[in-house]
């Protein structure tokens, strides 16, 4: 248990007792998907929330708990009803499975830790989170984005080459991720890829292809007395050679009591690329580009992710940033 984990637990233990003693009875919650969550489940979820979550996310689920000061990224404000990693298309409510996965795994590279909580408590607190925003009473969760069969098995090198083009070129069934994230090829390479995919000659000699710009998001960092956002967070698209991805772990780590294999890593990458990132500039790519291109993109991004903190990755970064790129 690290120092922040210990501090959060201590703060919770110092404050949770009084809140539990005075906590009012809860009414059953009728959800937009037709289910009704029993009051007993919600009250159990509240107990779990107060014990594990309150110190960061606050009594009211607004992300303003006593431990939240100075945290980056800031704790999620559940009152907004927005979730980045919901396992569904952008803009839809997340599935219970996706919320539970985040609770069990945490978010890599953030103060959101993996919590070793019994499954019944995970289920209960997932339902309790739905009391913070009326969307849950009015809408159904989105359709889960399923991980399809990998069409590139046994052809990994070919997939990476295809994925490089899918990443860097926009149009013709390609995603053009380098428009928000940075490019990882030289300017001449990018011009050649663009000509190959689109048949168009484009001059990339001007402009900064290797610095990402922070993008607007829907996530509040300041609210007024009514809880309405007055300022929202800027989100920097990750540089895969430098930044940790929230729902993807380094190979060899143990995630949910199992070794994190290349296959598991690839599935997690596919899931977030396919679904997109809710409330941010990252769109849903499932259905927007051909499935074989979506998987090829996954393979290519995986190679970049695994170059992070390596000599080869640093050398690539230096080549891209050199004057003769």
Predicted regions and their residues:
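Bacterial N-terminal signal peptides that target proteins for export
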Residues: 1-7
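C-terminal motif of bacterial Sec signal peptides marking the signal peptidase cleavage site
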Residues: 14-17
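Detector for the c-type heme attachment site
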Residues: 19, 56-63, 104-105, 113-117, ...
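Electrostatic cytochrome c docking/interface patches
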Residues: 22-48, 137-172, 187-189, 308-317
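Sequence/structural segment immediately N-terminal to covalent heme-attachment motifs in c-type
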Residues: 38-58, 153-183, 190-205, 269, ...
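Short pre-active-site segment immediately N-terminal to redox-active cysteine/selenocysteine motifs
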Residues: 49-55, 60, 74, 111, ...
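Short, solvent-exposed loop/turn and secondary-structure capping segments
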Residues: 58, 65-69, 90, 112-115, ...
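Extracytoplasmic electron-transfer domains, predominantly the class I c-type cytochrome c fold
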Residues: 70-116, 123-129, 194-284, 294-297, ...
